[in-house]
């Protein structure tokens, strides 16, 4: 007979919370408890099924394994209790070993954890690239004991509790649970005479200074991997990696979109009407001339080719887009007001074609609407 889905057994959905699952388990357990159903074989079977479902789904790692493999996660290796315990350990290693950075034998060499470092740079540094110096605390292999954790001349002995496996099995109900050995804490060995420098850990914490090359063109979220610069491994295992995540500080003038840069430049009303030339600064610290054409409207963009950001690990370069923002004059003198009034009197549809066309279209729209 095929096993029922564990979520179905408890009467919960796959997205239920731990609290919801606990309430459902208590309700079902009370309903089918053998003491409440004496002599009822079906109740006994139901109760065992409920208990098995809850024992699996209430444990985060087991639940992840069940969601991924289903009942097959617990049936590998012959279906017996020993098969269950060993298969679960293997599955948990597959699921979580890489994340924790501890793949390998249970009491053998273990890889050190990866480290993450967040680095914030300026847009100019992202443009030019830089050689950055990092000082960070990290675990390194203890030189005094060469990572063994034992004092010079002493050797660790096999843990008598787990027999060097680093894990022990405990019987719970009709199945077994495998857990980390409480005596050796998963090492598989006991250090009777620990190294004084590291206290038996095999690693010590030190500050290290590293030089990191930030290449031109890095963007927010760029990840730089320094292999072997993470935490030291244990029992002779390799060191983890150091991952540097780069972010860019907001710039007061430029906004970035990929390799392109955008900049808003205010121009006067007369510059917009008559045309002219403005000088802008580019990201490389140089100056560039931008020709403003006659009749430029606010929001119009002018492109300066190859004045943007370099493309990471490429010879390509983005562009710089200058967006003109027409500034309306303020605090006018009497003479300026008179001149603007004269200009307005001389204005026609030709001088303001967009406005004239807009109001003409609006008038036609509402006249046609009222005539329907």
From Swiss-Prot:
SMART domains: DnaJ (SM00271). One of its GO terms (cellular component) is cytoplasm. InterPro entries: DnaJ, DnaJ_C, DnaJ_domain, DnaJ_domain_CS, HSP40/DnaJ_pept-bd, HSP_DnaJ_Cys-rich_dom, HSP_DnaJ_Cys-rich_dom_sf, J_dom_sf. Its cofactor is Zn(2+). Pfam families: DnaJ (PF00226), DnaJ_C (PF01556), DnaJ_CXXCXGXG (PF00684). Residues 5-70 form the J domain. The J domain is necessary and sufficient to stimulate DnaK ATPase activity. Zinc center 1 plays an important role in the autonomous, DnaK-independent chaperone activity of DnaJ. Zinc center 2 is essential for interaction with DnaK and for DnaJ activity. Homodimer. This is Chaperone protein DnaJ. It comes from Beijerinckia indica subsp. indica (strain ATCC 9039 / DSM 1715 / NCIMB 8712). The lineage of its organism: Bacteria, Pseudomonadati, Pseudomonadota, Alphaproteobacteria, Hyphomicrobiales. The gene is dnaJ.
């Amino acid at each position: 007979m095929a096993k029922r889905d564990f979520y179905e057994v408890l009467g919960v959905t796959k997205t239920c919370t731990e609290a919801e699952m606990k309430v459902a388990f208590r309700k079902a357990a009370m309903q089918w408890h053998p003491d409440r159903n004496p002599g009822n074989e079906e109740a006994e079977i139901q109760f065992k099924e409920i208990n098995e479902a809850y024992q699996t789904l209430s444990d985060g790692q087991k639940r992840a394994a069940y969601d991924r493999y289903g009942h097959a996660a617990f049936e590998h290796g012959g279906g017996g209790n020993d098969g269950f315990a060993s298969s679960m350990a293997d599955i948990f290693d597959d699921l979580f070993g890489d994340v924790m950075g501890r793949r390998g034998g249970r009491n053998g060499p273990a890889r050190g954890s990866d480290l993450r470092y967040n680095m914030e740079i300026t847009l100019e540094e992202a443009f030019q690239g830089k050689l950055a110096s990092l000082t960070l605390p990290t675990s390194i292999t203890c030189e005094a004991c060469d990572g063994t954790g034992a004092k010079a001349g002493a050797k660790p002995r096999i843990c008598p509790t787990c027999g060097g496996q680093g894990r022990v099995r405990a019987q719970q109900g009709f199945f077994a649970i495998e857990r980390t050995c409480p005596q050796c804490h998963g090492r598989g060995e006991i250090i009777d005479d620990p190294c004084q420098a590291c206290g038996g850990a095999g690693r010590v914490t030190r500050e290290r200074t590293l030089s990191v090359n930030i290449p031109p063109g890095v963007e927010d979220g760029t990840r730089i991997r320094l292999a072997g610069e993470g935490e030291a491994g244990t029992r002779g295992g390799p060191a983890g990696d150091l991952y540097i995540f780069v972010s860019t500080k907001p710039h007061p003038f430029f906004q970035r979109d990929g390799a392109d840069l955008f900049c808003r430049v205010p121009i006067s009303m007369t510059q917009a009407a008559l045309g002219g030339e403005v000088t802008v600064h580019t990201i490389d610290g140089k100056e560039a001339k931008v020709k403003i054409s006659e009749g430029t409207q606010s929001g119009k963009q002018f492109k300066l080719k190859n004045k943007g950001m370099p493309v990471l690990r490429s010879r390509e370069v983005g562009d710089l887009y200058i967006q003109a923002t027409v500034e309306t004059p303020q605090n006018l003198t009497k003479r300026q007001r008179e001149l603007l009034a004269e200009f307005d009197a001389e204005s026609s549809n030709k001088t303001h074609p967009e406005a004239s066309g807009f109001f003409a279209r609006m008038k036609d729209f509402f006249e046609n609407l009222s005539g329907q």
